[in-house]
């Protein structure tokens, strides 16, 4: 009798262990306004709330800030973080790298659409054709960031695919806050910046700075910010993952109509002295959208595959994302 009792207890323990999910979710975020859902989730404890509703109480959520996709993707692969955010190229690069492996990476959802601007204080530069060897362009990460890829897409459009990297030699990596400070100083050794909101708007406050390139001229309305994770996290934590989707949906629904409150969260999290009224003016541009539906992902994928940036071409946007959002009308 005791044998059967011990066996039953053992089986119950195994069942409980199989149901066990993470007690902590570690997020990686960036400086941009492209991930405002993260700020809402953080301040309103949305993931914790939805996890508790699904039977995972006392979930701990932590947040770390990164500049650019390389370090975040390395952290995700090493297991140092669970969920990351970034531009489309960062997701595509890691999706292709892990495609067919035991731990593939896919998108959780899109987060935003927003215009990204290449600006300069060189009055002779009106289009990308005017850049010369004396110009230097700061962007979050050379070759791999969304800005670097957009510059390559613009070069391919201007000079053909064979010269897609024609302007790469002018670029170097610098965080958006530091590139803004340097550009506005006028003596930092570079004269152009391809950045993110709200920093590009801060740069354009200087009358000596003007726009050279708008990302919408290259891709049209397209997803800019995404969030992604590995199979290791997705598969082992079905309830936490379901809570994450619910939290993202609630945060996305909150932003319209609560812009100032949302931007107050962002200003606090960025640890920079930013005027919320100024940030709210940026969002008056209707091209800023905080939606989970992926859009124009295949435009990015086609370019990166055509130029050898990724070795695998997705058949559709659904290949790039976990199934929980496949009911959306994405592209």
Question: What residues fall within each predicted segment?
Answer:
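Sec/Tat signal peptide C-region and signal peptidase I cleavage site
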Residues: 14-20
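Solvent-exposed, polar/charged alpha-helical surfaces in well-ordered, non-transmembrane soluble domains
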Residues: 70, 74, 78, 92, ...
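Pocket-lining segment of extracytoplasmic ligand-binding domains
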Residues: 160, 166-168, 172-268
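Bacterial N-terminal signal peptides
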Residues: 5-14
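Short, surface-exposed acidic
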Residues: 56-62, 162-169, 270-281, 311-317
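Secondary-structure end/capping motifs
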Residues: 235-311
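Short, glycine-/small- and polar/acidic-enriched structural segments
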Residues: 21-164, 168-173, 187, 191-197, ...
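Conserved C-terminal helix/tail region of periplasmic/extracytoplasmic solute-binding proteins
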Residues: 304-331
């Amino acid at each position: 009798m005791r044998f059967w009792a011990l066996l039953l207890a053992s089986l119950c323990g195994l069942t409980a262990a199989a149901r066990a999910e993470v007690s902590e979710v570690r997020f990686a975020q960036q400086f941009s306004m492209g991930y405002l859902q993260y700020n809402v989730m953080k301040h309103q404890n949305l993931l914790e709330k939805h996890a508790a509703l699904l039977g995972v109480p006392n979930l701990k959520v932590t947040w770390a800030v990164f500049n650019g996709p390389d370090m975040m993707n390395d952290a995700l692969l090493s297991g140092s973080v669970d969920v990351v955010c970034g531009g489309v190229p960062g997701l595509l690069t890691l999706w292709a790298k892990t495609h067919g492996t035991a731990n593939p990476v896919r998108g959780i959802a899109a987060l935003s659409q927003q215009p990204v601007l290449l600006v300069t204080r060189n009055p002779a530069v009106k289009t990308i054709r005017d850049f010369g060897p004396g110009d230097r362009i700061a962007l979050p990460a050379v070759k791999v960031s969304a800005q670097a890829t957009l510059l390559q897409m613009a070069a391919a459009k201007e000079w053909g695919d064979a010269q897609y990297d024609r302007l790469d030699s002018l670029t170097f990596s610098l965080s958006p806050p530091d590139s803004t400070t340097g550009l506005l100083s006028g003596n930092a050794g570079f004269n152009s910046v391809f950045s993110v909101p709200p920093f590009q708007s801060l740069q354009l406050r200087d009358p000596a700075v003007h726009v050279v390139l708008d990302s919408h001229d290259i891709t049209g309305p397209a997803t800019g910010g995404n969030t992604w994770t590995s199979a290791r996290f997705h598969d082992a934590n079905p309830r936490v993952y379901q809570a994450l989707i619910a939290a993202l949906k609630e945060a996305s629904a909150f932003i319209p109509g609560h812009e100032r409150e949302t931007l107050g969260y962002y200003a606090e999290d960025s640890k920079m002295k930013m005027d919320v009224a100024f940030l709210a003016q940026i969002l008056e541009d209707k091209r800023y959208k905080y939606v989970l539906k992926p859009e124009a992902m295949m435009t990015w994928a086609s370019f990166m595959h055509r130029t050898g940036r990724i070795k695998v071409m997705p058949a559709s946007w659904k290949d790039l994302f976990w199934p929980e959002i496949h009911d959306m009308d994405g592209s």
